[in-house]
Amino acid sequence: MRVLVAGATGVIGHPLVGALRARGHNVSALVRDASRAPEADRVVVADALDREAVLSAVSAARPEVVVHQLTALRLLRDDPPEAFAQTARLRTEGTAHLVEAARAAGARRLVAQSIAFAAAPQGPPVLDEDAPLYVDAPDPGWAATVRAVAELERLVASSDLAGLVLRYGTLYGPGTGYARDGGTALRVLAGKLPLPEGGAGVTSFLHVDDAVGAAVAAVESEATGCLHVTDDEPAPAAQWLPHYARTLGAPPPRTLPAALAPRLLGWFMTHQLTTARGAANDRARTALGWKPTHPSWRDGLGRE
C-alpha cells in the first residue's frame, strides 16, 4: 500500500517508516525538515500547521493510508510548556489539516496517535477505552492537553475515512524521557523524583518497539475506533518508580508527604504518581491481532 507517515522524524515515526517499508509498503515521509527525514520511498516537506502546505504534500504522495504521528515532544526537556502547547495545536489544527488532505488525496484510511493516560481518575485502577477523558482536570495545562486529545479523536471519528486512534501508553525505550539519558531518568538519578505517600497512581507503559508494531498492524487492519496500546502490566508508582531507580543505579526515591507533592512535583506528576488510572489493552489485542513484545515494563524500563 501507499502509506504517508506524518511526523516521520519522531521517536515512533522514524522507525515506523522503516518497519512499513520492510513489510513491502511504499512509504512517504512527511517532515518539516528534509535533512532529518528517514530513508523513505518519498520525502514530502510541510509544516503540519500550514494547511496549504499539507494539502500539497499529501496530494503529491497520493497515499491510501495516512498515519498521524505528529507531536512536538522533542521540546519537552528544554521547554515543557511550549512542547505541550505545540502538541495541542498539532492534535487540533494539524489533525484537521491531515483529515482534509487525506480526503482530498483519495486516501481511504487514517491512523492517528493519542495517549492512554488521559482518562479521568474515577472508577477502577485500570480502565478501558469507554472511560471518560479528564477534560475538566483542575490543572489548566493538563485540561488543555486532554481537550486537544478529545478533539483529535473527534476529528478522526467524524471523518468519512476509516479512522483508528491508537492511544499509546507511557513510552519508554530509546529516545524517550525514560531512556537512560532521558529527562525522567536524569531526574531519578539526581534523586529529584520522590514518591508521594501511597504511590497509588497507575501507569501503563509501552516500549517504543511495540508502539511501532501496533502502528504497522493498524495500517494493515480494518479496525476503527479507539484502542489502548499498552503493555500487559499496569503498575502503581509504588512498584515501578523504585524498580526504575534500582535499574538506573539511582538512590531509592524518598517518600514525600502527600500534601507537599503538588508544590514540589507540580500537578501533573502528582496526578501520575497518586491518582492516574492505567489502561487495559484487551481490545487492541483482539482488533489488531497484536501483542506487546515487551509485555512488562519490568523487563526493559531503565535498561536502554
From Swiss-Prot:
User: What GO annotations for molecular function exist for this entry?
Assistant: aldehyde dehydrogenase (NAD+) activity
Does the entry feature the keyword DNA-binding, yes or no?
no
Transmembrane stretches, start-end: none
Superkingdom field: Bacteria
Q: Which UniProt keywords apply?
A: NADP, Oxidoreductase
Q: Briefly describe its induction.
A: The avenalumate biosynthetic gene cluster may be dormant under laboratory conditions.
Function, as annotated, reads:
Oxidoreductase involved in the biosynthesis of avenalumic acid (AVA). Catalyzes the denitrification of 3-diazoavenalumic acid (3-DAA) to produce AVA. It can also act on 3-diazocoumaric acid (3-DCA). Can use NADPH or NADH as a reductant, with a preference for NADPH.
Tell me which family the UniProt entry assigns to this protein. Belongs to the NAD(P)-dependent epimerase/dehydratase family.
What is the name of the protein in this document? 3-diazoavenalumate denitrifying reductase
Question: What is the phylogenetic placement of the source species in the record?
Answer: Bacteria, Bacillati, Actinomycetota, Actinomycetes, Kitasatosporales
